[in-house]
Amino acid sequence: MSSSRYILIPPEDLHPLTSNTGNEQNIYPDFDPWAHTEIEDKILLSFVAKGHYTSAKVNFESISARSSLQESLPKVAGMLAEQFSKVVHLREQTINKVSGESEESIRGKAKFTDLAGPGFSLPNRVTLTDQRRTQWLQELSSPNVSLSKLAKSIPHGFKRKQILEQCYMRQLPLQRAIWLIKSSYSIEWKSLTSKLKPGQTNEGVVSQLYNLWTNSMVSIMERLLFEMPKYYNDTAQAKIWKPRVSYYINLLGNCYNMGLMDRGVFNHWLVEFVEKVENFEFLPLSLHLLNIFWSGICPPTHGIEAPDNSFLISKITVVLLHKHHMILQNKSMINDENYIINDLQRNARLKESLLLRLKAFILDIFHHQSLEAFIMPNQNWDLYKNCLYEIVTMDKTSNEQAMVIKRKLELITYRNDSLQFNLLKQYKMKSSSLYESDGVEIDNLCDMQSILNVPFLDPEMTKILDNATPGYDWTLFVQQRFTCIEKVAQMIMWATNPSRKARYDGAHLVAKLLLLKTTSQENLPDYNMEDMIWKLVFHFSKLSERELSNIVELPSLYELLNIFIGYGIIKVPTYIRKLISSGIMYISDSKDKFFHCELLINLKISPLMKNQYNMMLKNIMEYDATYYVRYNYEQLQIQLNTAKEQMLQEQFEHISCLPISVKIWVSEWYLSYVCSPVDNVLKPVDKGTVIKNFTIFGLYLKEIFHFYKWVEFIVYHQLLADINALSALIDVLLYYENLFPLLINDQILFMKTLIHIYSKGLKNKDNLSYNITEFNPFWKFFMKHFPYLVEIDSDLQLQLGEVYESEKIRIEKLTKSSVDVITLYCNINQVNEESFKFGTHNFPGIFQQNLKILLKTESADACERARKGLSLLMLANLGDYTKFMSIFLKRKDYTIEQLVKLISVKLLTLDQIQKIIGDDILREILSRNNYGEGLWYELHKRNFIKKNFKIVLSMYRNSTSLDDRKLFLDLLVFYGPNSRLQEQVTTIICNCLRESNEDYSLILSLLRYGTKNIDQGTQETINIAKLYENLNFTNLWIFQAFTNYYTEALFNGATSDGQTITNFVFELIDLTRYNVLCSHLFDRVANFDVLEKLLEVFEADFFKKCLSEDPDDVHFLAVMIETIMNLSRKMNQSSAVISMNNESFRLLQATMLKFTSMNKTALCNSEMKLSIYLKIFIVHQKFIFQKVCDSLRQDRYDAEADLVKSLRLLFENTGFKLKLRLLLYDILSSLKSFVIYECTKKSESKRETRKLQISEALQNLPPFHISSFLDDMSISAHGDFDFLGLTEQPTPAEPEEGSQFFLYNKRTREYECGLNIEPFQLLPNHQSREPGSSCHFFNDTALSLSLFDARFDKKNPT
């Protein structure tokens, strides 16, 4: 082809000298005409006429110019210094100042001020009447009226919101609406600029106008959106509303694109609006808005640079993931009265549509935005991780992109995990092999600790179970914690442990969790769960009697298994088949068969299994015939019939001795009996019946499940006779508060029915008791623990509010109105109001009279009237009531039983007893149990102990009574695992150990609580370290308290056993067999110096292990790093910077040098050590960063300065493990930010300090992209692009028919010739070689074309 290199292109803004005639070529001058001024003419004439001469600096040109230069250089330097000073001042005052507005908004804010050319004038503001203004708007909305006629004036007082409202209400044509907005903008701007005050600028006025207009546009848009529910059932109004919204969105889009609003403010509003929308009815329109303005919020980056609004992108990412998660979890999208909730097809379509739109947004961010958008806090990542994986993996992509997507997901996951910095993943313990094999085939006896060391042990799960509250979200717990089948064993052993036997809700809670797991989407197979339960039972049978009693409370195990049977989780036939196939029942020297026989006797057996049950008992008759003789199926039926007859005769004492299977049959029969009508009429239930049935079901039979079934029956059938019966029932519900959500199937329906009974039925039936009885604690209990249920049902919320407020007003009225009090008192005692006077002067007489009747009279009616009278006195005048009750208590004319009775009927509190009488009486009262008046006494006692836990325990701590000592242990064991009281428990245990002079019998008593072998041991027989062999997840809180005491004693040298902290901590790790719980032993250590010493011991040992050549012990290292992490979290609560001593810092530097000297193979083998090292580095990173900065500031090239280079070198050499590389990237990026901050920070010292130099290794840190975390050496060595998701393209051969590209001549508008180029556009750029050359040449076709204003065009040349 002919070269066009020297062809000149005609200039654009210059006219030719000759006109273009025919085919002649235009001729252009090579200079522009001179446009000069009068002054320039004078200067030119004077220089031309007189000439110009510049005299020499020296007299003779031959003389050296050195003197002249020496003179001028200092002047030049001074001038240069002045200029540099001005530059620095300008930089600090102008350039480096952070503007309050975004650059985008500043760039686009002056468009409307460019009005027009000469002769243009803005419309005038004219005052019009309402009628004329309406007429003007009608003409403006009509396209038949010329705009030039209307453009001369605009109505006065017609601004912003009014203009926008009229635009969408009258549906102005968009061009005219934009003209009106622009004109109003300009008029306001012109008015404001004419009134500028000193110091104000035009930019400030423009910014103010943009904010005002944007806020107006946003508020109207928000108002229109929230008006939507008003028109659901009004078709006529909905037809008006829809066009208005559509028009206004269109108008907003035009204003957005034309720069008539602050885009930054609008984008932030839109993201926040989508975030705060919770009702699904607003979501479709919100997502539609987001779709319209999506390019402004998330502009495409093409992977080059992150946009300026990265914060907004991160925020909208979290919002979209949250919406996606909420829609997936929600069952119904429809909230419309015209549709039923069970409209499954319509609901599924809505759900699918919303999810598709959300997925599209999230995928767009994932593919086209920076990965930083998916870096989020711990709680968000845990919640949305599965959503992100589901969205991305369901996206249909080509094979080439699949690996890139996988790499991105790994990068996001590891980055979040490294920032989250959780503990290491839990690993299987050495004893987990017991759970991996079939339990029924194990011939050896399992040891106790092997069973307790369950695989995948989760201490956090035990903590949550111990702190269970009524309203806890157990569905979320199952999703996040119940992740593998091995967790079943941990939950069962938690519920059946002797230390948890006082937990009334343990068995029912575990059963509910297993049910939730079986019904969840990611459920465990039923047979796997049942097999795991029976395996654990067979493991229990292998234990000796002593070991079994240490870890299992057998009645609790029987109760739990029967609940499982009731819910269908396990089946007795399966258990019997396993017993038969195992052959255990036929082995003569096996003691397992007796355990299984006792278990079978206590399991509920159906009549169909009668023969198999009897057969199993017959098989051991030669070893022990009593099992079959006493407990065969027929004998159990006889015990059932006997129990029925005794219960009908009100004889309940012998029921407690029955096997649990018989108790279940008796409970089912009694439930049917009390729910059956008499003469076709259901008998009303009074207070006595409630207490009696609770005593039978809850105390004698231990079947609280059937009691709750009876409670549901009497509530739904509205059988409560009076307020007293309701009060007794509510006391039971409050005492067993954790069972409320577990055993009440429909809490909303139950509460609605209960409120209806209270406010409609009993209010009229028992109005007297209604006015003096408070139920607000129960209403508050429900609203506090079940807010989600209250939000779901607006009717329930309204009813709860009504009863709560009405009761509150009623009680306040009694305190202010003596007339109402007199009326109520007269009605209680059935006396005439005229003959009775109630006042301050006769309050003592009334109080003493009623109190005497209550305590001394045997008549139930008289006691009830006295109780109501005292309750009325307490409500009417609490101050006087408390005063006279104090006088009564000080006289000490009462018995303990009488005080307990006063507490049981809610007329006395334990706080009053503690304050007035003292601890002696209080201690005796707390040791009593009383159920005669219901459960209020037990409920009040429990609440008092929780509130005054430390005081109560101190009363029993030093008591010599065996009963007091037992109660002290009971309280410690029951409340010890509770996180809210654990600090107080730890303090009490430590004080007891200090006072006992190294007598550790208290620890042994706590460890052996509930067992039969209470061998306390002596001082000489107790080995401190060997105590930790008993460590398991159920008694961790005991060892935490003991570790707190003992480590502090070792630190202070207060022990006499010759131990040191170093020996102690490593000995207990060995003795616990690297138990994962060992890392939590120091969670209760409060002394900061002790924590610092412990951290120093662990880190020094780890560094020495890294420097040695010993093989790695994976289990030991796992326990060590978890311990270090826990200690660092504890220290971070007290100090922001965790320092290191000189020896530890020296070891850290030496370990870094060893890692940097390793090759990649050695580093790969030391991966776990390097990971732990980096986490220790992060623990001390503030301290280390300060050391590095001090070294860089002083220009010392010592170990601290080399640390930066070593980190960067490790970053380059750890391509084999992405997580390690991300940890190093976190450290390097944090160090870079820290150094930059130190550079800009002003020195506190006035003297000049050396400027901090940023290391080149930090300056060249790559951005957070995929390419920054790929192993370049492996790429260049292997040439393999598969891991990027890219396939190598073969170089296409040159087409035979001609070239694929042609040169196009702009002048002649013809294709001149073909152009042969190399396929540089392919990703694997295979360069061709020059003829006779063995090296590659650079394909610069695109660069060459650009030099001639040429480009590639995708148009078809034909």
Curated annotation (Swiss-Prot):
Subunit organization: Component of the SRB8-11 complex, which itself associates with the Mediator complex.
Indicate where this protein is primarily found. Answer: nucleus
Q: Name the UniProt key words of this record, in alphabetical order.
A: Activator, Coiled coil, Nucleus, Repressor, Transcription, Transcription regulation
From which organism does this entry originate? Answer: Eremothecium gossypii (strain ATCC 10895 / CBS 109.51 / FGSC 9923 / NRRL Y-1056) (Yeast)
An example of a Gene Ontology cellular component annotation for this protein is: mediator complex
Q: Which InterPro entries match?
A: Mediator_Med12
Upper classification of the organism: Eukaryota, Fungi, Dikarya, Ascomycota, Saccharomycotina
Q: Which gene encodes it?
A: SRB8
> In its UniProt entry, what is this protein called?
Mediator of RNA polymerase II transcription subunit 12
Taxonomy, superkingdom: Eukaryota
Q: Which protein family is named in the record?
A: Belongs to the Mediator complex subunit 12 family.
Q: Where in the cell is it found?
A: Nucleus
